[in-house]
Amino acid sequence: MTTAVTQATIDGFFDASNGDPFATLGMHETEQGIEIRTLLPDANRMVVIERESGKEITELDCVDERGFFVGVIPNCRQFFAYQLQVFWGNEAQIIEDPYRFHPMIDDLEQWLLSEGSMLRPYEVLGAHFMECDGVSGVNFRLWAPNARRVSIVGDFNYWDGRRHPMRFHPKSGVWELFLPKASLGQLYKFELIDCYGNLRLKADPYAFSSQLRPDTASQISALPNVVEMTEQRRQANQANQPISIYEVHLGSWRRNLENNFWLDYDQIADELIPYVKEMGFTHIEFLPLSEFPFDGSWGYQPLGLYSPTSRFGSPEAFRRLVKRAHEAGINVILDWVPGHFPSDTHGLVAFDGTALYEHEDPREGYHQDWNTLIYNYGRNEVKNFLSSNALYWLERFGVDGIRMDAVASMIYRDYSRAEGEWIPNQYGGRENLEAIEFLKHTNWKIHSEMAGAISIAEESTSFAGVTHPSEDGGLGFNFKWNMGWMNDTLAYMKLDPIYRQYHHNKMTFGMVYQYSENFVLPLSHDEVVHGKYSLLGKMPGDTWQKFANLRAYYGYMWGYPGKKLLFMGNEFAQGREWNYEESLDWFLLDENIGGGWHKGVLKLVKDLNQIYQKNRPLFELDNSPEGFDWLVVDDAANSVFAFERRSSNGERIIVVSNFTPVPRHNYRIGVNVAGKYEEILNTDSMYYEGSNVGNFGCVASEKIESHGRENSISVSIPPLATVYLRLKAK
């Protein structure tokens, strides 16, 4: 036996306790010459071959029958490139020895990782194809600073943790191993001995591809190439442009009729993209597509943040879906969940035995609403892991924006917690200062590295400055969901029209704070699940009134300042709640089944999108008081509202809504500019299955004072309807 290696050291490899394999394995200088030591459980013989010439150098001695081999090359003083001829019974193969290769992570990379200032840590950590000393392979790296030992296991080594223990870099807490001949598509995990001596089998947090549940392995996959931002996509994201978002859950938008199984990314591209284009939406927003273990979470409890879910195909197929959207002139937004993660054992929980990604104290680290764990945003490596993930989706898949989920739960330490269930910040306050800094940092990274991409916050409180620049003390988002507007207006619409007069302010209150943030008006998936009923189901009255109410509400929403978001199925007034396990009720568009009602709503949404895109007053000055003026704000008795939308070049559209089933004929509205106003939309049109009350295409102003204005128009406002009147150019 070699005197340089003790039996205890050898035993450490086989009981998986040796955390420094490169100190023993590979080439080492000794007094007698270069000594080569290898670990290959179950091998019978081992011969060293000079790589360049193919010449046999020496046969190694088996010093431990479990598979530890040693041999000295006498008088050899220089390291050289070699291969190993391994004999397994009667079979032999020539392999590269992973332990002859030098470290590939440099000091600067380690420093940047530890500082949390590496812009793209996914280019360093995880599994990456590369070449070392002329040998192709995959370099695996994992951050697990408190583990005693880490091995890479997978299809390439029979999932045997003894075979490929990794090199530890104490400066950064990163483990590394270059594995020659590892190939695309092979499955792998990291086997850790944690700080307490427990064995843990973990998926790669930076994996670019992962198995479909219930399997949990990572898959070797190439880092996708960068997708450059185009001027067309950048322009479509601007605050002065029309943004109408179709929110989609890919697993239930449409399914295979034969087996109710999911469509794949390519099938979705074939069917969804033309539909969205035809309907006039400018953006698609996908519910989260990072790999997640539980279907019922809809993607909002992800574990494989860098892996597009394999439910619908490969990462390459998802890139094709995004590309197809861009070719159709549609931008793509992705729901993104940096607020919490599930406690599945193969994931991030207690990763190296310590609370590495989460907080140790459940008052900070446990989310009781969702039974999930909360990220430790104060840890550099965790903050960087998350913020760079947003950039990854934008750069590597061409996604045009992210919608950040549950921001309120991140920025408040007492979110959904009773007294005594949370820990104040260092100043005694309730704000999560580390999370706030993380949000600012993430938005800075997005906007500095991917100019033109947008970030949208789902933030349900009145936290100030969500869409203000970070240099002005804001969080730096481009847009914020207007949850207040959504809750108020839906509460109003649920009321029987006879009672709406007593809640008139619910439809007007949003303008009090309209210019405090840049808003998106969201009718999202959250409003059509968990016993809340569908949007149609929320509307009062008989069938005619339900559909009329919904059409009037949509008209009001598309006329109101703010970008638009509509969850799938609402564009044709699906009657039942959304079910993530089934396709939407497309059969309702069959007039023999739906009676034409649903098709009428579909036509309306399509027309609303077209009118919205073609008329600058409806979108250009959403965030400026110059773009809006109440004309009728106080007619609670009749539940009538009228306001004017304006563009920067003087174009004007008047939006008039009547939320009672009583038509209002000869209703006088004061106008700011005298002239003729053409009716460009009427939600009561027979084309939408309405009663067809209207204004015969046009109304002219008269010099009759009304609502404090010298001129006015007399209009017929249909029952439960919204009308758009556009000032005709002179």
Swiss-Prot record:
Pathway: Glycan biosynthesis; glycogen biosynthesis. It comes from the Bacteria. It catalyses: Transfers a segment of a (1->4)-alpha-D-glucan chain to a primary hydroxy group in a similar glucan chain. GO terms for molecular function: 1,4-alpha-glucan branching enzyme activity; cation binding; hydrolase activity, hydrolyzing O-glycosyl compounds. InterPro entries: A-amylase/branching_C, Branching_enzy, GlgB, GlgB_N, GlgB_N_E_set_prok, Glyco_hydro_13_cat_dom, Glyco_hydro_13_N, Glyco_hydro_b. Gene3D superfamilies: Glycosidases, Golgi alpha-mannosidase II, Immunoglobulins. Keywords: Carbohydrate metabolism, Glycogen biosynthesis, Glycogen metabolism, Glycosyltransferase, Transferase. This is 1,4-alpha-glucan branching enzyme GlgB. Monomer. GO terms for cellular component: cytosol. GO terms for biological process: glycogen biosynthetic process. Its EC number is 2.4.1.18. The active site is at D405 (nucleophile), E458 (proton donor). HAMAP family: GlgB (MF_00685). It comes from Haemophilus influenzae (strain 86-028NP). Belongs to the glycosyl hydrolase 13 family. GlgB subfamily. The gene is glgB. CDD domains: AmyAc_Glg_BE, E_set_GBE_prok_N.
